[in-house]
Amino acid sequence: MALIYPDNLRYFDSHEYVRLDGDIAVIGISAYAIDQLGDIVFLELPEVGSTIAIGASFGTVESVKAVEEVYAPVTGEIIERNEAALEAPEILNSDPYEQGWLLKVQLTGKPDLSDSYDAAQYQALVEGQ
């Protein structure tokens, strides 16, 4: 199955993505990372009201193959976490971008996306691995 990388997202080396909506960032894990992990069986995410800082680990994703940390691509306060994904983590396998997002974050300042990739750049990066 071909992996999809939506054009409206920014992607990072650690395989998280960000969708910006004004000063709100939606954070998730790319289809490539999900494909590499296999079937997702457990998620651990911080509580609403917590803050995350760019580059810091904020949770874990457990699959049948491995447990991986998830890193914050932006800094801000968590205003929503995906409770549906926490209850049924396999949703990340079927729809990592729409239903399988992880957190919504109120940004602290303007996000630094200089280390991010657009969809075409990210696809070239992961297909070269």
From Swiss-Prot:
Keywords of the record:
Lipoyl
Determine if Nucleotide-binding is one of this entry's keywords. no
Gene Ontology annotations of biological process type: glycine decarboxylation via glycine cleavage system
Cofactors that this protein relies on: (R)-lipoate
A Pfam family in this protein?
A: GCV_H
Residue ranges of domain Lipoyl-binding in the record? 24-106
PTM-bearing positions, type N6-lipoyllysine: 65
- Lineage: superkingdom: Bacteria
Q: Describe cofactor binding as the record notes it.
A: Binds 1 lipoyl cofactor covalently.
**Coiled-coil zones:** none
The cellular component terms of Gene Ontology attached to this UniProt record, alphabetical and capped at eight, are:
cytosol; glycine cleavage complex
Q: Which family does it belong to?
A: Belongs to the GcvH family.
Subunit structure as annotated in this protein's UniProt entry: The glycine cleavage system is composed of four proteins: P, T, L and H.
Please report the name of this protein according to its UniProt entry.
Glycine cleavage system H protein
> From which organism does this entry originate?
Synechococcus elongatus (strain ATCC 33912 / PCC 7942 / FACHB-805) (Anacystis nidulans R2)
Report which gene this protein is encoded by. Answer: gcvH
